[in-house]
Amino acid sequence: MSIKLIAVDMDGTFLSDQKTYNRERFMAQYQQMKAQGIRFVVASGNQYYQLISFFPEIANEIAFVAENGGWVVSEGKDVFNGELSKDAFTTVVEHLLTRPEVEIIACGKNSAYTLKKYDDAMKTVAEMYYHRLEYVDNFDNLEDIFFKFGLNLSDELIPQVQKALHEAIGDIMVP
């Protein structure tokens, strides 16, 4: 049996702790994969635009499973968009806004969106992971295809917030 595809996660797997990789070595390995007919796939919860920034030379040759599977692109062409309906998006946002301990990033195809009112520390972290990020006054009337939400909250609150979100919106999304 021969290898047909190699898929890698980025953070903590393909990338070093400094969010880099040995490009020269990888490009040599990639050329070997191509010669053997092996597809290379980047799979990550990260934004598509961040992922392609790591592979500018070959972004239109490889596949990306971005946004935790919400957006799949192969050889520069959309394969899948896990679009939330407008009603589902609104329901989720309305619920998340009732939780002041949660800072929200709405992840869309054109951009990610977060609120202007959030503090600079949160914005700095968000900018590391979202190459396209817009600051908005609210989440009303955003025109985009939305895949998921990124949430920022303190680690000790995660179990209780996750449980509460599952109960409140688990029929729409898996928290």
Each predicted region: which residue ranges?
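Short, small/polar residue-rich loop motifs at catalytic or cofactor-binding pockets
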Residues: M1-S2, A59
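Asp-based phosphoryl-transfer active-site loop
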Residues: S2-K19, S44
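Short, basic/glycine-rich phosphate-binding loops at helix/coil junctions
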Residues: V8, W71-S74, D140-D144
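An N-terminal domain-start capping segment
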Residues: D11-Y21, F89-T90, T124-M128
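Short, contiguous strand/loop micro-motifs
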Residues: S16-D17, V79-F80, K148
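Active-site phosphate-binding/coordination module
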Residues: E24-M122
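Conserved acidic, metal-coordinating active-site core of Asp-based
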Residues: H95, E101-E103, C107-P175
